[in-house]
Swiss-Prot record:
The protein's name: Small ribosomal subunit protein uS10c
GO terms under cellular component: chloroplast; ribonucleoprotein complex; ribosome
Swiss-Prot/TrEMBL keywords: Chloroplast, Plastid, Ribonucleoprotein, Ribosomal protein
Main location: plastid
NCBIfam families the record matches: PRK00596.1 (NF001861), rpsJ_bact (TIGR01049)
Organism: Porphyra purpurea (Red seaweed)
Native organism taxonomy: Eukaryota, Rhodophyta, Bangiophyceae, Bangiales, Bangiaceae
A Gene Ontology BP annotation from the UniProt entry: translation
Record's subcellular location: Plastid, Chloroplast
């Protein structure tokens, strides 16, 4: 038994700003649906928190520390049954520079 797989595009988005990420996801889903492809998502992935601990004083006072954190938000969008028009429209899409995009076919 051989199962034929439908063509699928998986888009992984990553950004530090969640509002920028959400607007980018909306643009991608709208573009995919405009070209009659089936868009599944955006599926939120767990947010990664990086916490950095820094000494406030340059010399003494080891007890005085300051914490900084940076959060990276991630989303996945799957596009099923993409056509060549869908791929062309996604390539021409203008997204903000603060969003990291990874595309797999």
């Amino acid at each position: 038994m051989t199962v034929t797989q439908q063509p699928k595009i998986r888009i992984k988005l990553k950004a530090y700003n969640s509002s920028l990420l959400n607007t980018s996801c909306k643009k991608i889903v709208d573009t995919a649906e405009r070209t009659n492809a089936i868009a599944v998502g955006p599926i939120p992935l767990p947010t990664k928190r990086r916490i950095y601990c820094v000494l406030r004083s340059p010399h003494v006072d080891k007890d005085s520390r300051e914490h900084f954190e940076i959060r990276s938000h991630r989303r996945i969008i799957d596009i099923h049954q993409p056509s060549s028009q869908t791929i062309d429209a996604l390539m021409k899409l203008n997204l903000p520079s603060g969003v990291d995009i990874e595309v797999k076919l």
